[in-house]
Amino acid sequence: MDITGDSATVDNKGTMTVTDPESIGIQVDGDQAIVNNEGESTITNGGTGTQINGNDATANNSGKTTVDGKDSTGTKIAGNIGIVNLDGSLTVTGGAHGVENIGDNGTVNNKGDIVVSDTGSIGVLINGEGATVSNTGDVNVSNEATGFSITTNSGKVSLAGSMQVGDFSTGVDLNGNNNSVTLAAKDLKVVGQKATGINVSGDANTVNITGNVLVDKDKTADNAAEYFFDPSVGINVYGSDNNVTLDGKLTVVSDSEVTSRQSNLFDGSAEKTSGLVVIGDGNTVNMNGGLELIGEKNALADGSQVASLDLPLY
């Protein structure tokens, strides 16, 4: 379906399947467009489900959307003041992008469930000045994926739902200056190896942590010993003149393993995990809330395996 003209409205209540590279299920070229997707959409092999080229566009997705494969995109808006409302389920795999909102003063509101997995996969990508991102849904990110990729200046990010971040993945990656980030999540759980909950890179950003953040790498995973010394982090802040305030609860769980080496120089190894990392000049950290550090002992099945991985003999 291809519509050209301003103030168009499309109500899609049926099933949409896009399987051909560079094919588009619904395309609207014009300003003030509204597209309502209430049915089930499946986009694979480099296709795009809904694409709106124009300003003041709105896409409302309340159905079930599955997006798979490199260059595949579920919903894309190219224009200023675009709004994407997610109130259904979104599954993104194989390097696909669930949502792309490209333009200034764009908004993405998620109230639904988002599952993102596999290298290069991004649940929501937004790029433009003055962006607004709001999440009150449940988000699960794993296997080298990114939940939200946000590039903006003077934007606003509010996370009030729940999020779980698995192996080698990032829940939210924010790049830009003078942004406001409110982390009021009821549960942000960083459970994967080399995983990051929230990554903020830029200057003069404000980060308020009012919810619950837990960093606890899964010690029962098959790769737990291999990545024992590689840190997982709750919140990373890089740049200058940033302001970070902890009013919520930040919990970090770290395992220690009683180990031995042939040289008998090492009798223990500590797992690397971090709750909050702030790097740069002129940054301010206000600790008003609860910081809880929990130690575990011998949570891995074979602690002797750990010491042989990274620690050198002297």
Task: Locate each region found by the language model.
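Long, low-complexity, polar and repeat-rich extracellular regions
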Residues: 1-314
